[in-house]
From Swiss-Prot:
It is an enzyme of class 5 (isomerase). Pathway: Carbohydrate degradation; 2-deoxy-D-ribose 1-phosphate degradation; D-glyceraldehyde 3-phosphate and acetaldehyde from 2-deoxy-alpha-D-ribose 1-phosphate: step 1/2. Mn(2+) 1 binds at D9, D324, H325. It comes from the Bacteria. Belongs to the phosphopentomutase family. This is Phosphopentomutase. Its cofactor is Mn(2+). Keywords: Cytoplasm, Isomerase, Manganese, Metal-binding. The gene is deoB. Isomerase that catalyzes the conversion of deoxy-ribose 1-phosphate (dRib-1-P) and ribose 1-phosphate (Rib-1-P) to deoxy-ribose 5-phosphate (dRib-5-P) and ribose 5-phosphate (Rib-5-P), respectively. Binds 2 manganese ions. Mn(2+) 2 binds at D283, H288, H336. It comes from Thermotoga maritima (strain ATCC 43589 / DSM 3109 / JCM 10099 / NBRC 100826 / MSB8). Disulfide bonds: none annotated. The lineage of its organism: Bacteria, Thermotogati, Thermotogota, Thermotogae, Thermotogales.
Amino acid sequence: MRVVLIVLDSVGIGEMPDAHLYGDEGSNTIVNTAKAVSGLHLPNMAKLGLGNLDDIPGVEPVKPAEGIYGKMMEKSPGKDTTTGHWEIAGVILKKPFDLFPEGFPKELIEEFERRTGRKVIGNKPASGTEIIKELGPIHEKTGALIVYTSADSVFQIAAKKEIVPLEELYRYCEIARELLNEMGYKVARVIARPFTGEWPNYVRTPERKDFSLEPEGKTLLDVLTENGIPVYGVGKIADIFAGRGVTENYKTKDNNDGIDKTISLMKEKNHDCLIFTNLVDFDTKYGHRNDPVSYAKALEEFDARLPEIMHNLNEDDVLFITADHGCDPTTPSTDHSREMVPLLGYGGRLKKDVYVGIRETFADLGQTIADIFGVPPLENGTSFKNLIWE
């Protein structure tokens, strides 16, 4: 038996009760995107029950639905990829990751400069493409490292490959990771951001590398691998979990590549396993850029390929589709939004047309997957296997 878990990065379905604390009242990524384009065409997710979850223009409610459906609330504080995925896997954060809207503290930057032997420029929240355009020439002249953050808990280091060789950049990231941990700053990811080319047409290269914080507790991935059930990550799963509990990981170029790799794993791995896929384009390419038209198109492209995924399920396999947070492209904010996420499930062993309600935590999904595999339970979450199992 295989479980295929697909996270549509940032595809939220309505504000959380505490959204006002995050400045996210009124956010509803799916519904507002559908309104912006006068209706979404998502017939395959509609069949599973997506239209039963909210009033989504173009996505009709279907009775009886072919799948199980519900929504999940986020119990952890925060609204980012790491927090969302950890919670799906059973780890609930007590305190949120640190954010640096004013840049990093002076003593941290000074110590980082001392340990790397290079000066730091930037030190502010910025768009990666904009900051290299702004500071690239100074970096080329002086060899100073471009350090910046975003609305997420990240410490990013950009450097031109011809000025700072890749291995050296990665070493600086390791220094930053150690230093943040030592000084007690809870930063989710340190990210190497190499670029090349000439000003003003610098291009970021694909050798981006994440140096993530390890999950604060045992995840579903740890429990599965400890019990002999491999976990195959597609996309940035290994980065999110700092490699822990991931048997093999397959990096992706874009959503379609992620779907291709998921399908080829389904064809290839005929043993008990979890195939855990993150499709990130919704978030990085369209949500943050407030581009509802392209966001809608990406949702429709995923939906059009859903039958291929379903066609490759064996009789006892289970497919779950969910998200990790919101990123409403129709609101003035370019940041993530604090939202509930949709949950759809399908498989030969699952009942049809079951509404699993609004779950109190994303961890209910991880707990259910642990229950399906018959491994020891996770620390958090309530399994709903009894509601959905034939």
